[in-house]
């Protein structure tokens, strides 16, 4: 849920390992982290904020101004400084030491339920699994493409996925892996 409990069309995408991605949001409408970072702040469903108002509030706090000045120079926080700070922060969030990662290195053992989840994830539909790894593969569990996730579209067809960015019929109901 977003601002004042408003319900959006999609769940939030993961914010880790963004340095390896080549598009952002489930529909790929942003090509870089920098293109992405300010959109949720200004979206009427997510944070419903006016960027100038956010900058005004940030600039009212002396500690924020001092921190931004140390990092970026000028004393006044600008939109460019804000997106740069958010981009820099997001690019530091890296996952590579989860329990699953540790199990691959034989540092820990998955419990039976976790191991069943692993089996389902990596086993094809034809062999009794969920087939997740057909799209979610490699070290980042993504092939960085757009695919139909196999779920039925919303009854009102309100979320056309990648099609809303490209306008191409072939992109209807495709989402980032």
Language-model regions: role of each:
Residues 39-42, 47-125, 133, 137-142:
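Post-cleavage N-terminal segment of exported redox proteins
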Residues 1-39, 101-177:
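Short glycine/threonine-rich turn/loop motifs
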